Amino acid sequence: MITDTRPETRPSAGDQSSAIVVARLDAAQLAALPAAQWDLLTRNSLTENPFFDRRQVLASLATVDKGKKVGALSFSVGGALVGLFLFQSRSKIPAPFPVANGLANDYLLNGTPLIDRDHADAVIEKFLDLVRTGGAPAIWAFDDVDLDAAVFQKLRAAVAATGMAWATATPYQRAYLTRLDGGLEEHLTQVLSKNRLKDVRRTMRRLGEAGHIALEHVEDEARLPGRIDDFLTLENAGWKGEMGTSFLSRPADAEFARCSYVAGLAAMDSLLLDGRPIAMKLSIRTQRTAFTPKIAYDETYKKLGPGMALEYMLIEDFYANDTIDAVDAAATAEGHSALNFFNNHKSMATVILGCRSWQVRLLAWLHDGRETLKKKVLEFRARQAERRHAAPKPDVET
């Protein structure tokens, strides 16, 4: 295991040729990794992944994933952490052979490993060598990753060079916001349809008539915990609470939220009506992209469109400030509301790689098959709901 505790020790790019030390860790050993080194790796990773931030992962292992069999491969150079591959054996996809699945749950929505940008080639070469020679699991599945991200571009090239097998499954488009050269006005005219823009402006006018509206951004240690609790309450009061999918529906999930969405990682943006939040959006970031995995709004104001208003105000704020370079909707399915406001997208999928091509192909087929079945079930339920709604109600004698 890596035991060096120097707070800001990061090997230079010139150390690429230094011997890479690899350790296979269980959950307890993962939790014991030097915090400063894990944090430094997260900030300097080739492809940003705040879902594998130390606070997210350790909160997960202590709450929603407590008892789950989790492992990791750590890569170090000169005592400094330069790579971290987090995985689990459990998966929603049954396979007839062992698979290292990227660590995932309802809240960890990106399986991209953390690889130091200055040591990426060496770490990837070492990782694939371990996979080929039996020093690591022989087949890996990385869920919900950006196919165009630098890590997977390098991985794919290295896999091809070694003759290993590569496949992708369950593709979808994720909304992604970047700045247009023409600024906010160009964004509004090119990204939003005329009807959408009219709806937004009508919504803003109606909200303004209802009271004083303002956008609030909170990320400091003093105020953030209170706004996290406000978000949990707001989310639970709506349809997610009724469906049992809100954070507060399960004590472990609520504890995860309070432990992981902390200052230094998380921020909360709120649409305030007369000082009270009626729509809230959670974001996390470790570099220059904000990932927004959760949004909630007060359903008593549903007709006023608070969610739409918040999205619009955040677009305005994005162009008015340069704190971040991009926003990732962090949704694991298409159809996210941000698609109406964001100008770009990422090509997302599950990446599968391994030594045996038949295993890789079979696992990709299983992933795609489960996704197809899931969509058919959802379509069937939607049709059933429509029929129940359309069915004539029986006369009731009075």
Model-predicted segments: where are they?
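Active-site/acyl-donor-binding loops of N-acyltransferases
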Residues: I2-L25, S89, F152-E185, D322-T398
